[in-house]
């Protein structure tokens, strides 16, 4: 049965000599697609360019769940990006965010609200210029949909415990952040993408808070892996 769905490209991997396996997040959860002979010189139908990281697509194809490979009959760009794939900083950010999503979105994920958040966030990212801190706000907002957004009450307390997700006056060396990094963490909580220009961070603070957020994800998500692109990404924003 052929169905039509909106989709966000999460990953694409070459399979064999000429095939491609693409993983996409849809309003009905994660879907995997096998595109046969897409690398073949005889392929005249579907371009590999459709399947760049975080592209927003509209796909007509089969709709099998549980990790089974689907086929694509037709694919179109749902929203055209104007800057993400032509700007090395944005492109690197997109690859990094796609790697994060690949680790946190499971086969059984079925969330229209998460899909809507991602769809809107990536359009905003494409349309705006001052996006050096976008990935930080994105990661923290993403925790709302993954079930471990920080408890915001008592934010006047001296520490934030990453393990418990709360502000506290009880210091635990392995779990707590404090001082300037705590202030940056507080600034990220509740901020809108439209207010990003007000967030002024040094490259050093940006890298430290990114490591804090990666640790926060590792604590709360079993099997979460730091993206392979993280070190290259950090170098670009040094």
Residue ranges and their predicted role:
Residues 1-238:
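Non-catalytic alpha-helical scaffolds and adjoining flexible linkers that form interface surfaces
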